[in-house]
């Protein structure tokens, strides 16, 4: 036995000597983002606070009255070296998200409360960048893989690929595979069904595959053109399945132009994007832009052959002086489901849903830096939504928010903020009479109101 161990050690020693990985520069970081506070609606039922934005648009038209939420982002960063050669930057990232549902304050609820505190894990992944000193990078896991956003609306408008999967990149070219299947098919193309094999019936999931290719072209003046292409596919169910779903697919093409602008203070920019998706890749509703969240009901064959979605976005920031910054945006989206109906049709689970919609939202934020630490924020937004052949629901929203910026920077990105928020929304007749916002679902007023104190932060 002793001789066997000696021989084994001799065999393993060369491998250990020539391939030992030394971990250096080990670091732990903890970041956090969030928004929390209190507020009420002076003219609302029970003065209970409810979001003022139009239904189906999420935070588009501003999010000063957004639900409480908080993210914790622990991460481990390390740089392994192999025999003194070039290093690789490796990060293990986790994001723990918590938010309150049903309009409740986060501190007044818990996970035991019905529709109360919700805890999610939207990020757990490993990413290796510049592998062995090369221009190659790779990642695997689940992550918020998203880029430019309209911050005042929390709207990641072009390339939000948040889901589970993996990806590789070389220089400015990225290839990604996502698999966003779920047993909860509410609001998205159904993946879950049951299959009977040898007399036993068990649940199964159709695995949607989302192949994504992206390439960025960088210019000497700092401007960037980004090209996007996607292909989505879901397979057919077998003869043993209790439900028949045909195979289906879709594709996406898009282009985004980002251009830095020369103003008195740095940081100004203009961004413009166009994206078109077809088939099951026509997602983009409820304030998100996930192309895999298929919109609308299918056709008579259970497919989305003629479905589409078109979205264009304009977004800019102007840092005009030490006193003034202006952040503006415009969003247009038109989507069609798989059905030929101009109004409503039947979804897979038997419910009726709209087959066509159009969103138009424009707005902006004006920041006046009264002092280094007192910033006066004003916002104006206009939003409209047309579902099917219904009349248009529309809203104007106005917000004034004196803000304490304790870090004392005259910068639109300076955080944390402590804000005193006053918001008022004026609805048209159709929106008011048809409950076209969470606020209007418990009130039927021409004007919706909100007064509150909120804090917003991101610390990394």
Briefly describe each language-model feature range:
Residues 1-21:
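Bacterial Sec-dependent N-terminal signal peptides
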Residues 19-140, 171, 317, 325-326, ...:
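Beta-barrel outer-membrane channel/assembly domains of diderm bacteria
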Residues 26, 64-70, 117-122, 158-164, ...:
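Residues that define the transmembrane beta-barrel architecture of outer-membrane proteins
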Residues 36-42, 78, 96-102, 142-146, ...:
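Transmembrane beta-strands of outer-membrane beta-barrel pores
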Residues 39-62, 104-122, 132-246, 294-299, ...:
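Surface-exposed coil loops of outer-membrane beta-barrel proteins
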Residues 79-85, 129-133, 261-264, 405-413:
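Alpha-helix termini
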Residues 190-201, 357-361, 383-399, 403-413, ...:
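Outer-membrane beta-barrel transmembrane domain signature
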Residues 220-234, 244-387, 395-404, 457:
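Detector for outer-membrane/organellar transmembrane beta-barrel domains
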